[in-house]
Curated annotation (Swiss-Prot):
Ubiquitous. This is Nucleotide sugar transporter SLC35D1. Keywords: Disease variant, Dwarfism, Endoplasmic reticulum, Membrane, Sugar transport, Transmembrane, Transmembrane helix, Transport. It catalyses: UDP-N-acetyl-alpha-D-glucosamine(in) + UDP-alpha-D-glucuronate(out) = UDP-N-acetyl-alpha-D-glucosamine(out) + UDP-alpha-D-glucuronate(in); UDP-N-acetyl-alpha-D-galactosamine(in) + UDP-alpha-D-glucuronate(out) = UDP-N-acetyl-alpha-D-galactosamine(out) + UDP-alpha-D-glucuronate(in); UMP(out) + UDP-N-acetyl-alpha-D-glucosamine(in) = UMP(in) + UDP-N-acetyl-alpha-D-glucosamine(out); UDP-N-acetyl-alpha-D-galactosamine(in) + UMP(out) = UDP-N-acetyl-alpha-D-galactosamine(out) + UMP(in). Belongs to the TPT transporter family. SLC35D subfamily. It comes from the Eukaryota. One of its GO terms (biological process) is embryonic skeletal system development. The chain crosses the membrane at residues 37-59, 69-88, 158-177, 187-205, 217-239, 254-276, 281-303, 308-330. It is found in: Endoplasmic reticulum membrane. Pfam families: TPT. It comes from Homo sapiens. InterPro entries: Sugar_P_trans_dom, TPT_transporter.
Length: 355
């Protein structure tokens, strides 16, 4: 009898590790599936942002330069109104959710509405003033400013490789600018201000999303809502509203289509920016934007109509583009290695707990 009890006891002890091992395998499989889904969502968000960002630059350039629409402010105003209208209808139909307006909302959103307004208007002004290749190469400065913003606001650090590739992009931009025959001081000033505001906006969006107070739809809605009246007032007092009303192209169906698309794309780009920042990071969003700019650079050279070719400018553009590609590769590689290391640490901790 004693022998039988000993055998049963040994069998039970032998089964425990097997069960533990099975549970651990199931946990690893579940984590792997979740990680695959997360990577897919990250790529989807990044791709959505890249396509949206590409389309809005092309459409805005067509409206402001090809059709010579006189008011960048009114284009920005149209984008704000479209954003508020779409999200208001979405909330009424219960497709999206975000908190109702109360006296605490301005505090929760600040300073994002101001950054959003400045980012949008300076982006439109610089799109109008600069040819597409120089517009895109000067946007490389947004990566440098994003690094500073994330370092200050989010306490992030960056590797030597990242810093060197950013340096290469900036050098390329300086080389290209040194022989830009279509140089426009106003355009250069607007694009550099836009770079600073883009960096600050990306870092603050990440910070606000992490706090989970308003959510991505709330941030989009209130950013646009709070800046409609100030933008309308500025457009009225500067005479931009009058110029827009007197514009002769309103009878052109193709112009109307592109103007409407520009307004709607403003909302889509805002949503894509927040989505990409939420699933990835402010820096990744900036990287995707710069990769998109590579395509715009070459398209702008051939089809833009306002690019003046010089070898120095062309070489500078390509130095900056090469830096962008290497930078993107290093950043994504480092991010994946970091996440893999974190996942392995979690598995090790769970494995020890199971044993």
């Amino acid at each position: 009898m004693a022998e039988v009890h000993r055998r049963q006891h040994a069998r039970v002890k032998g089964e425990a590790p097997a069960k533990s091992s099975t549970l651990r395998d199931e946990e690893e499989l579940g984590m792997a599936s979740a990680e695959t889904l997360t990577v897919f969502l990250k790529l989807l968000a990044a791709g959505f942002y890249g396509v949206s960002s590409f389309l809005i630059v092309v459409v805005n350039k067509s409206v402001l330069t090809n059709y010579r629409f006189p008011s960048s402010l009114c284009v920005g105003l149209g984008q704000m109104v479209a954003t508020v209208a779409v999200l208001w209808v979405g909330k009424a139909l219960r497709v999206v959710k975000f908190p109702d307006l109360d006296r605490n909302v301005p505090r929760k959103t600040f300073p994002l509405p101001l950054l959003y307004f400045g980012n949008q208007i300076t982006g439109l002004f610089s799109t109008k003033k600069l040819n597409l290749p120089m517009f895109t190469v000067l946007r490389r400065f947004s990566i440098l400013f994003t690094m500073f913003a994330e370092g200050v606001l989010l306490k992030k650090t960056f590797s030597w490789g990242i810093k060197m590739t950013v340096f290469a992009m900036i050098i390329g931009a300086f080389v290209a600018a040194s022989s830009d025959l279509a140089f426009d001081l106003e355009g250069y000033a607007f694009i550099l201000i836009n770079d600073v505001l883009t960096a600050a906006n990306g870092a603050y969006v990440k910070q606000k999303l992490d706090s989970k107070e308003l959510g991505k739809y709330g941030l989009l809605y209130y950013n646009a809502l709070f800046m409609i009246l100030p933008t309308l007032a500025i457009a009225y007092f500067t005479g931009d509203a009058q110029k827009a009303v007197e514009f002769e192209g309103w009878a052109d169906t193709l112009f109307l289509l592109q103007f409407t698309l520009s307004c709607v794309m403003g909302f889509i780009l805002m949503y894509a920016t927040v989505l990409c920042t939420q699933y990835n990071s402010a820096l990744t969003t900036t990287i995707v934007g710069c990769i998109k700019n590579i395509l715009i650079t070459y398209i702008g050279m051939v089809f833009g109509g306002d690019y003046i070719f010089t070898w120095t400018n062309f070489i500078g553009l390509n130095i900056s583009i090469a830096g962008s590609l290497v930078y993107s590769y290093i950043t994504f590689t480092e991010e994946q290695l970091s996440k893999q290391s974190e996942a392995n640490n979690k598995l090790d901790i769970k494995g020890k707990g199971a044993v």
